[in-house]
Amino acid sequence: MRYAIMVTGPAYGTQQASSALQFAHALLNEGHELASVFFYREGVYNANLLTSPASDEYDLVRAWQKLNTQHGVALNICVAAALRRGIIDETEAGRLELPSANLQPGFTLSGLGALAEASLTCDRVVQF
């Protein structure tokens, strides 16, 4: 089956994002296709390059990035939610005349159209 995941919880503070990542790995291990992960609302914090967990904590942001590089899973974050929460890429930093970007490599700023497309092209969309 072809799946998409929507994550609405931050990298730290709730179980949503870590549960979503575990579910993503379970899907791939069972031979399913994971087309994309869409980060919405507080979920956009999973794409913050500046997140720096303690050395004895799991680095969820880099784990998502690893999912992208190893399995080619698209990591889309809602551009409106991201900008409201201070998550920006180089293009937006330039447009807004900000000194730098903080979007973790592997993530892409996207509109809700990416979520709509996933809903239309996947067999299941699972929200965390």
UniProtKB/Swiss-Prot annotation:
<dbReference type="GO" id="GO:0002143">
    <property type="term" value="P:tRNA wobble position uridine thiolation"/>
</dbReference>
<comment type="similarity">
    <text>Belongs to the DsrE/TusD family.</text>
</comment>
<dbReference type="InterPro" id="IPR003787">
    <property type="entry name" value="Sulphur_relay_DsrE/F-like"/>
</dbReference>
<feature type="active site" description="Cysteine persulfide intermediate">
    <location>
        <position position="78"/>
    </location>
</feature>
<dbReference type="InterPro" id="IPR017463">
    <property type="entry name" value="Sulphur_relay_TusD/DsrE"/>
</dbReference>
<dbReference type="GO" id="GO:0097163">
    <property type="term" value="F:sulfur carrier activity"/>
</dbReference>
<dbReference type="GO" id="GO:0016783">
    <property type="term" value="F:sulfurtransferase activity"/>
</dbReference>
<keyword id="KW-0963">Cytoplasm</keyword>
<comment type="subunit">
    <text>Heterohexamer, formed by a dimer of trimers. The hexameric TusBCD complex contains 2 copies each of TusB, TusC and TusD. The TusBCD complex interacts with TusE.</text>
</comment>
<keyword id="KW-0819">tRNA processing</keyword>
<protein>
    <recommendedName>
        <fullName>Sulfurtransferase TusD</fullName>
        <ecNumber>2.8.1.-</ecNumber>
    </recommendedName>
</protein>
<dbReference type="InterPro" id="IPR027396">
    <property type="entry name" value="DsrEFH-like"/>
</dbReference>
<comment type="function">
    <text>Part of a sulfur-relay system required for 2-thiolation of 5-methylaminomethyl-2-thiouridine (mnm(5)s(2)U) at tRNA wobble positions. Accepts sulfur from TusA and transfers it in turn to TusE.</text>
</comment>
<keyword id="KW-0808">Transferase</keyword>
<dbReference type="GO" id="GO:1990228">
    <property type="term" value="C:sulfurtransferase complex"/>
</dbReference>
<dbReference type="Pfam" id="PF02635">
    <property type="entry name" value="DsrE"/>
</dbReference>
